[in-house]
Structures are given as structure tokens and as C-alpha cells.
Amino acid sequence: MSRYLGSVCKLCRREKEKLFLKGERCSSNCALNRKRGKNSPGQHGASKVKMSDYAKHLREKQKARRMYGLTEEQFSNYYKTAEKMKGSAGDNLLKLLELRLDNVVYRLGLASSKKMARQIVNHGNILVNEKKIDVPRYRLKIGDVITFPEKYKSNVIIKKLIEKMVSSIPAWLSFDKSRIAGTVVSEPLAGETSHPINSQLIVEYYSK
């Protein structure tokens, strides 16, 4: 399945909640803040019927997949990997998704959206332990240090992002503004995703 190229606002309307796919722009100009935006996409929106258990499981899986910008195949592969790990498959899945390099760049505040974070990584503008990594799915581990090459640290856009950075960096990450470097200090817990996800519903979806 190819990557979705349509309006990301439609995806939020489909899930009936903000997924913050456009970063900070979602807060100020979100379709969900308007009456029409609260309906599902389409001329008349979705009919108001009680969702089946399967539909609830599907919607939660789709919400998570869209939040991390993954194709169906990519998301399914993450779940298969999570199942093989020790512990809860749901918790393992969220851990794998959160430790993606593009997601960590976003969570550190080095990009205004996950899409921007993916582009920054794809263009080779991120170093992990002083080595250039241009693979968004690269899985980070405890102790990894994420930063920009020296020539990019003076970039106007990067400086503005650092200036606007708020104290919302999750506890499993740390950031040194003087060095413009972030560090993975621990593994993320299930409740530390950028947006609430009920991983148990996803497990039940794949268990069918």
C-alpha cells in the first residue's frame, strides 16, 4: 500500500479526534473545531450507528497507523515484531513505534510535525551518535544521542524550533539546548505516547 497523499485533516475527521498530523497548525486551524469538521469525510458524513467491536478495533489501529505515518504493511510488520518480544504485545508495539528515529526527532521538538521530522531524517540532516542516519524507521536504544550536523545548527528554522521548544519532552528523553542534542534515557512506557492509544484494541484487532 502506498503512503497516503490526501488531506490529513480528513484523517482526523475520520477518527473524530485530533491526530496533530500538521503539528502546531492543528491547534489553531483545526477542522474539528468547526461544526462540519466533527462529521466524517464525505457529503453527508458517516451514518450514526453503534460501532461494532471490530469497528472499534479497526479505528484504533487506523488511528495509530496514521499517527506514525505508516502503511498497512509497515504497521503490520511492527505488530508481528512486537508479538515475538517478551511482555505485552501492545506495550511492545507502542515502544517500537515511539523509538523510531523520525518520531524521536519530533518528540524532542526538532520538527514541528512528524512529516517534517521524516523529511529531516530522509535528507540526511540527523546524526545518531555522530553518524548520519537517513532512515526514518531506524530504531533507537537507550544512550543514543540525536543531534544535527554542525553546519545545520545555525540554520534559522532550527534556531526558531529550539526557541519555541516547550517543556513537553517526555520523561524517557532528555535535551541539551546548549549542544542541541537529545538523548534516549530510558525506554518509553505505554502511557508516554504523543497521543493516547489503546494498544489492547489493536491487539484484539490482530487476534481476530
Swiss-Prot record:
Q: Any idea what this protein is called?
A: Small ribosomal subunit protein uS4
Name the NCBIfam families for this protein. PRK05327.1 (NF003717), rpsD_bact (TIGR01017)
The upper taxonomy is:
Bacteria, Pseudomonadati, Elusimicrobiota, Endomicrobiia, Endomicrobiales
A cellular component term from Gene Ontology for this protein is: small ribosomal subunit
**GO terms classed as biological process:** ribosomal small subunit biogenesis; translation
Summarize the subunit comment: Part of the 30S ribosomal subunit. Contacts protein S5. The interaction surface between S4 and S5 is involved in control of translational fidelity.
- InterPro entries in the record: Ribosomal_uS4, Ribosomal_uS4_bac-type, Ribosomal_uS4_CS, Ribosomal_uS4_N, S4_RNA-bd, S4_RNA-bd_sf
Region of interest called Disordered, as start-end residue ranges on this chain: 32-53
- The S4 RNA-binding domain extends over 99-161
* Family label: Belongs to the universal ribosomal protein uS4 family.
- Is Signal included in the keywords of this UniProt record? no
Q: Which Gene3D superfamilies match?
A: Ribosomal Protein S4 Delta 41, Chain A, domain 1 (1.10.1050.10), RNA-binding S4 domain (3.10.290.10)
**Which keywords fit this entry according to its UniProt record?**
Ribonucleoprotein, Ribosomal protein, RNA-binding, rRNA-binding
Role = One of the primary rRNA binding proteins, it binds directly to 16S rRNA where it nucleates assembly of the body of the 30S subunit. With S5 and S12 plays an important role in translational accuracy.
**SUPFAM superfamilies of this UniProt entry?**
Alpha-L RNA-binding motif
As one GO molecular function, the record gives: structural constituent of ribosome
PANTHER family, A to Z: 30S 40S RIBOSOMAL PROTEIN, SMALL RIBOSOMAL SUBUNIT PROTEIN US4M
PROSITE patterns given for it?
RIBOSOMAL_S4, S4
Q: Which organism is it from?
A: Endomicrobium trichonymphae
